[in-house]
C-alpha cells in the first residue's frame, strides 16, 4: 500500500494577528505536521536561529536562488524578500507528512495556484486596535515599522476572501481547535 502524500496547510494573517504563535501550538499538538521554513533577507529577531526559524540569506544569495527556480513561491514584503524552498517541502510531502505554511497572501495565492493538496486558512484579528496593541506588545519593531504594518493590514485582510477558511483569533485556544478541526477534516477528505 502506498502512503498518501501530505497536505499543504497555509496560515496567513496580517502581521501580529497570531499566526506564528498558532502555528507553533499546532505543531505541538499534531505530530503529523511539519513547519515549512522560509528563506528571508530580513535580519534575525532575538532568539531566531538560521535553519530553525528561517534560512537567513543576503539579497544576493536570495536572488541567486530565485534565478535557479529553488522556491515554491517568493515575494518582497516590507523591503525584505521571503520565499519557500521547494526541496524540503517536497521531501516532507512525499513522506506523507503535512506541511504547515506561515506565509502572506501573495505566497498563499502562488501555492494555491500550483498545489492541488493545499488548504488555506486566514486568521483575522478581533479588530485593528487589538492588532496594533499586539504589535506594540511584542516590541520587535520601531514605531515606523509598526505604522507600516498597520497600513498594510487592511490590504492583507482584503485578500481573506481568497482563502478556504477564515477564523477570527479572539480566543487563542478556541482558534487552535478550529484550525485543527479543519486539518483533520481535510485529511479525511483526501484519504
Swiss-Prot record:
Keyword Transferase among record annotations: yes
InterPro entries, A to Z: GK/Ca_channel_bsu, Guanylate_kin-like_dom, Guanylate_kinase, Guanylate_kinase_CS, P-loop_NTPase
Class of this enzyme: transferase
Catalytic activity: GMP + ATP = GDP + ADP
Pfam families: Guanylate_kin (PF00625)
Keyword Kinase recorded: yes
Binding site for ATP: 13-20
Domain Guanylate kinase-like: 6-184
UniProt xrefs under NCBIfam families: guanyl_kin
Family the UniProt entry places it in: Belongs to the guanylate kinase family.
Name by which UniProt lists this protein: Guanylate kinase
Amino acid at each position: 500500500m502506498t502512503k498518501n502524500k501530505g497536505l499543504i496547510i497555509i496560515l496567513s494573517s496580517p502581521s501580529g494577528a497570531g499566526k506564528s504563535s498558532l502555528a507553533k501550538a499546532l505543531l505541538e499538538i499534531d505530530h503529523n505536521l511539519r513547519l515549512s521554513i522560509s528563506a528571508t533577507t530580513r535580519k534575525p529577531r532575538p532568539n531566531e536561529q538560521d535553519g530553525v526559524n528561517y534560512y537567513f540569506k543576503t539579497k544576493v544569495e536570495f536572488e541567486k536562488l530565485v534565478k535557479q527556480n529553488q522556491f515554491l513561491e517568493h515575494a518582497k514584503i516590507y523591503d525584505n524578500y521571503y520565499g519557500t524552498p521547494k526541496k524540503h517541502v517536497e521531501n516532507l510531502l512525499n513522506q506523507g507528512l503535512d506541511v504547515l505554511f506561515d506565509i502572506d497572501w501573495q505566497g498563499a495565492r502562488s501555492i494555491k495556484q500550483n498545489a492541488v493538496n493545499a488548504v488555506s486558512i486566514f486568521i483575522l484579528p478581533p479588530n485593528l486596535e487589538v492588532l496594533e496593541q499586539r504589535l506594540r506588545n511584542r516590541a520587535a519593531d520601531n514605531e515606523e515599522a509598526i505604522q507600516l504594518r498597520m497600513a498594510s493590514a487592511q490590504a492583507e485582510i482584503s485578500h481573506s476572501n481568497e482563502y478556504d477558511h477564515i477564523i477570527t483569533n479572539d480566543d487563542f485556544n478556541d482558534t487552535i481547535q478550529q484550525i485543527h478541526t479543519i486539518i483533520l477534516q481535510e485529511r479525511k477528505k483526501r484519504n
